[in-house]
Amino acid sequence: MAKEIFYSDDARNRLYEGVKKLNDAVKVTMGPRGRNVLIQKSFGAPNITKDGVSVAKEVELKDTIENMGASLVREVASKTNDQAGDGTTTATVLAHAIFKEGLRNVTAGANPIEVKRGMDKEVAALIDALKNISKKVSGSKEIAQIATISANSDESIGKLIADAMEKVGKDGVITVEEAKSIQDELSVVEGMQFDRGYLSPYFITNPEKMQVELSNPFILLFDKKITNLKDLLPVLEQVQKSGKPLLIIAEDIEGEALATLVVNKLRGVLNISAVKAPGFGDRRKAMLEDIAILTGGEVISEELGRTLESATINDLGQASSVVIDKDNTTIVNGAGEKSAIDARITQIKAQIAETTSDYDKEKLQERLAKLSGGVAVIKVGAATETEMKEKKDRVDDALSATRAAVEEGIVVGGGSALILASKSVNLNLQGDEAIGAEIVRRALRAPLRQIAENAGFDAGVVANAVETSKDANFGFNAATGEYVNMFEAGIIDPVKVERVALQNAVSVASLLLTTEATISEIKEEKAMPAMPDMGGMGGMGGMM
């Protein structure tokens, strides 16, 4: 297929048109008074959203070169969302502003490579300045404020996320689901829970709830199948003498072994229950080891030279209670040493940082949460499915922003942080590098200007007021139209969101500025289909 090539300013100008069209669609969602965007779906009701990345993902342009420009900035929004969970609109607005300002200078004769170098130096200095003006998150009030802002000023969502994080801790897993009603709900599973239920209903101790409830049980962990009762007898006799209940977690228990355990339970000889070990393969071994560390026990493993017959009561873990239903097992207050649990948590965090697989990362985070203290489930309620999707998007954004804030700290929000950080940066660059740095500094006003514009205020006046202020916490509250102390007003942003948005925006804008040619396929207009054969109509002449 024939290709079309554009060079120099012509190529960059067409790329800019695509970036501008994407930015114009995304920027309207910015700030507390940002507007919604209605997105047509191939089937079903249209999607209403105020989420920048959701808008960006839907933008596909007819012109091939314009679409290339738009797709690069779309990647900025997606990458920012993946890394920080929020700041997608900020990243898009910054990328557009940097490219626009840079294009003007490159067209006027500036060297794009030198300009890029100056931009990179300015960004590195700005990130250090951001860290210097940041504060650590000190309590659930600030967590609620961050979540509220990210959820488009919805205080109920902010409170819900703050409550969830308070209950499960910063490393706990918080999942978002759709509720069956119009009310938002928060439920918390304390302790370690895994998705394996009892092996026999005869183990049930609470018939009303159809649950097995064990108080202060011993916990035996074995990584193979148990089919022969003879191997179990030594440890069973020791547990019976202690008078405590026993939970067996093994790959499987079947045949004679399971039947004998059930008979002993029914006769009241031993209060016992059994479940399959969670996970598969290497993940199962890791989870058994997690349970062992949490409960202060040991995994009886033939790989370590241990047989089930050699197990003693000293190898067993303990917990204050265990609850088992047909689908799940929950271990509460394991007797493991805190230092051992903390060491295991550190090890899992290191594995999360190293892994490149999203699936492995998700599973490792689940394990981390189970060791750290629980899982919280936020159930989002709404009157219609369309509203539910929009609200769920906002809760996901707010949750990610909150995690980012806990991780790297907070700065003033409302688009002011980058402007305030730039006041302490003075690199004294020369030539085209200085132009690159100035391009970034000018672009830093764009998010604040857009927030003010969306709220119906004069963008230039607002940006100038923040820029000339001597107060390090000064900013503009677009919801009320007042200049305030941003920390006192609770208008705060995570440092990570600002940092990632700036880095990604400059990265793609500098790539676009240093583009000297574009190559794309020529779209060929499809020929009109031929008229159908009018055979048989010729005989109409005889009708005259």
Swiss-Prot record:
Pfam families linked:
Cpn60_TCP1
Subcellular location(s): the record lists: Cytoplasm
Q: Which SUPFAM superfamilies match?
A: GroEL apical domain-like, GroEL equatorial domain-like
Q: Tell me which InterPro entries the record gives.
A: Chaperonin_Cpn60_CS, Cpn60/GroEL, Cpn60/GroEL/TCP-1, GroEL-like_apical_dom_sf, GROEL-like_equatorial_sf, TCP-1-like_intermed_sf
Alphabetically, which GO biological process terms does the record hold? protein refolding
Q: Which UniProt keywords are listed?
A: ATP-binding, Chaperone, Cytoplasm, Isomerase, Nucleotide-binding
Chain positions recorded as ATP binding sites: 29-32, 50, 86-90, 414, 477-479, 493
UniProt signal peptide: none
Q: Name one GO cellular component term.
A: cytoplasm
On the tree of life, the source organism's domain of life is Bacteria
The reaction(s) annotated as catalysed by this protein in its Swiss-Prot or TrEMBL entry are: ATP + H2O + a folded polypeptide = ADP + phosphate + an unfolded polypeptide
Is Cytoplasm there in the keyword field? Answer: yes
Entry GO MF terms: ATP binding; ATP-dependent protein folding chaperone; isomerase activity; unfolded protein binding
Write the Enzyme Commission number(s) for this entry.
Answer: 5.6.1.7
| Assembly description | Forms a cylinder of 14 subunits composed of two heptameric rings stacked back-to-back. Interacts with the co-chaperonin GroES.
Report the function annotation for this chain.
Answer: Together with its co-chaperonin GroES, plays an essential role in assisting protein folding. The GroEL-GroES system forms a nano-cage that allows encapsulation of the non-native substrate proteins and provides a physical environment optimized to promote and accelerate protein folding.
Q: Which protein family is named in the record?
A: Belongs to the chaperonin (HSP60) family.
Designated name of the protein:
Chaperonin GroEL
Which species does this protein come from? Campylobacter concisus (strain 13826)
Ranked from the top, the taxonomy reads:
Bacteria, Pseudomonadati, Campylobacterota, Epsilonproteobacteria, Campylobacterales
